[in-house]
């Protein structure tokens, strides 16, 4: 693979990992609520509903850096053409991807800390046209990347990942 005038080797490999086979009644669950303002809220609970812990995952300095870069892009686009701003958009994209990696790592670390058997995400589907003030925030929200990265890291640690319907999850959460 050639990138930035340098050559790199990339090897693919498979890894055999046994996922936890705990009975449903004895499982420890890590439920994750991905948000726009707070990056994620993790709740550790038993199958009977006993809450063992809760953690708010937020990286405000990283998000502030990203929004600062987006403001610089906005100012630059006003003065120049949008073609000349591609490198700045690439930088913002890399910052956003790094933020999603940090969030996924923090979720997996928290689940492993409590020896969770399964991590549960809500299945978030975005349909239709987005308008209004939070349009850019929603477009930059890397919910699917966070879920994929977290799934990969969790499977390497032997933790299962499950998706549930997003309907009524916030209303029914205690």
For the regions a language model picked out, list residue spans one by one:
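Short amphipathic beta-strand and strand-loop transition segments with alternating hydrophobic
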Residues: 1-3
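Positively charged, helix-rich recognition surfaces that bind polyanionic ligands
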Residues: 5-174
């Amino acid at each position: 693979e050639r990138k930035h005038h340098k050559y790199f080797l990339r090897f693919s490999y498979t890894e055999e990992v046994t996922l936890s086979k705990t009975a449903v009644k004895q499982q420890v669950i890590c439920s994750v609520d991905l948000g726009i303002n707070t990056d994620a809220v993790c709740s550790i609970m038993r199958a009977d509903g006993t809450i063992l812990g809760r953690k708010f995952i937020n990286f405000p300095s990283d998000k502030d850096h990203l929004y600062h870069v987006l403001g610089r892009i906005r100012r630059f686009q006003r003065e120049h053409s949008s073609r000349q701003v591609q490198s700045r958009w690439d930088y913002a994209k890399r910052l956003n991807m790094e933020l999603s990696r940090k969030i996924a790592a923090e979720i997996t670390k928290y689940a492993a800390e409590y020896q969770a058997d399964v991590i549960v995400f809500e299945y978030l589907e975005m349909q239709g046209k987005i308008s209004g003030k939070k349009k850019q925030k929603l477009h930059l929200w890397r919910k699917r990347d966070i879920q994929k990265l977290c799934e990969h890291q969790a499977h390497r640690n032997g933790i299962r990942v499950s998706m549930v319907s997003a309907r009524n999850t916030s209303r029914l959460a205690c």
